[in-house]
Amino acid sequence: MSLQVELVSAESKVWSGTARMVIAKTIEGEIGVLAGHEPTLAVLAPGQVTIRGEGGETVVAHVEDGGFLSIDHDRVTVVADTAALVSGSAR
């Protein structure tokens, strides 16, 4: 099973696609998301969001001003005030 992931900033879509895992820093600590994760809404802390693709590729984005992370039915949406790719490619 895979996750449908969308990472957006206030200005644009930063990345979207399928992944096997998402790791993000929240105000309560780091969270790792795999397929089948319980529905969750979390407040992001400034830091990195790491997306591990199904083919082994890794995408890393830096979130500067926080935002939120929504998980529901294997869909992960990361909405950040400011976000930019550090490594990996935009899709």
What residue spans do the PLM features occupy?
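Compact, glycine-rich, soluble single-domain proteins
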Residues: 4-91
